[in-house]
Amino acid sequence: MKATWDKLENNWMQFEVEVDASEFSKSVEAAFRKMNRQVTIPGFRRGKAPRAVFERVYGKEALVQEAVDQILPRAYSEALEQGQIEPISQPEIEVVQAEDGKPLIFKGKVQVTPEVTLGRLSGFGIEKQVPEVTDQEVEEQLSALRERLATLVTDESGEVGQGSFAVIDFEGFIDGEPFEGGKGEGYTVEIGSGTFIPGFEEGLVGAKAGETREVTVTFPEDYHAQHLAGKQAVFKVTVHEVKKKELPELNDEFAQQVSPFKTVEELRADIKNRLSEAAAQKAEEDFRNKVVEAVADDASVEVPEVLVHDKVHDMIHDFEHQLAQQGITLDMWHQITGKTHEDLHKELEPQATKLVKVDLVLAAVAKQVGLTVSDAELEAEFDRLLAMYPKQQSYIRQLRASAAYRAQLRRDLLKQKTVEHLVELNSAA
């Protein structure tokens, strides 16, 4: 087999592939044997009809087309390997010649991984900065713990104020008529939380337990229920009870309730240690990101649109998954925000372009430095996944048997190894 490759503009390459006549004839014969077993020709058992009879009934063109379908993907893959070409798009292929007894010739073009011109890999003067945990941060964590164990008790004053919890019945009216979703009973609202429409909670300030009052509000123009957006409504609200939040006392008993420690001081020390560990971890992550960003910024590469499009597609898929965890579909999100799919795509493009450039630069660094991922390292990662997710054994074994997933995991591991290499270079600098 012969293959020629020529560069075009914008990371495209054109190719022409010629498969030997003898090899193509073997493929045509293999196509005949396969198709002969699949059809019935009168007077012959399935698979036993002579080729001449088969061709008279179904035509020689059917055999040639089947042979092309079988050999072309294999020949294209071999051509990529011969030319050491890394495609980033599906090829556009045209069959030039396909006749039994003659070479199979096809040509086409494909977009390939762009050339990356690397700059510096180190010497950026990036320093790892680990902030010291303050006493205020520790106290904020303690306050959050107290908030979690807070209880609501009756406010003896009986008057609604900022921070109060009012137990209410309410019904809303627009132009004197009640509307769907505008009624509730025994609802507890925290004044100042912003849970309700702007103006509703403020309208309850000063109300007494047992009092009924009217609160006038205007629904926001971007309100999710479009039939209510921008409209004025009057809510009839009855305050049944006023409560206030009561925090547990910060003492040793509290420490024992929320932790395995016996004293508040031990709890404080543990919180400070955990905050320090988190700060160190974040500092390490920030350092890694800054190093990778600096290396990418110092390199030059023409980022292909097809890769940006694919990255945006992946990002939208991830976003859709995040929404699903909140019980929201992407269509619902579009309705709530008023943004179209095209708007979302356009918003994500700059970030996607940056991410694609980073991937291309890291791949170029790995190639220049000579970093690789061995089969042993790949298998070790699968073993690690099996140990980490004991309930997913069957699924992980399926992934282990998938050539596509193995290739993806190898790329991910190589990317990790490359980042570690750059971090090491810049830590020593």
Swiss-Prot record:
InterPro entries found in the cross-reference section: PPIase_dom_sf, PPIase_FKBP_dom, Trig_fac, Trigger_fac_C, Trigger_fac_C_sf, Trigger_fac_ribosome-bd_bac, Trigger_fac_ribosome-bd_sf, Trigger_fact/SurA_dom_sf
GO annotation (BP), single: 'de novo' cotranslational protein folding
A GO term for molecular function: protein folding chaperone
This enzyme's EC code(s): 5.2.1.8
Entry keyword set: Cell cycle, Cell division, Chaperone, Cytoplasm, Isomerase, Rotamase
One GO location term (cellular component): cytoplasm
Keyword Cell cycle: yes
Cellular localization per UniProt: Cytoplasm
A Pfam family annotated for this UniProt entry: Trigger_N
Listed PROSITE patterns: FKBP_PPIASE
Recorded catalytic activity of this chain's protein: [protein]-peptidylproline (omega=180) = [protein]-peptidylproline (omega=0)
Residues annotated as domain PPIase FKBP-type: 163-248
Domain notes from UniProt: Consists of 3 domains; the N-terminus binds the ribosome, the middle domain has PPIase activity, while the C-terminus has intrinsic chaperone activity on its own.
Family affiliation: Belongs to the FKBP-type PPIase family. Tig subfamily.
Function: Involved in protein export. Acts as a chaperone by maintaining the newly synthesized protein in an open conformation. Functions as a peptidyl-prolyl cis-trans isomerase.
Protein name listed in UniProt: Trigger factor
Source species of the chain: Symbiobacterium thermophilum (strain DSM 24528 / JCM 14929 / IAM 14863 / T)
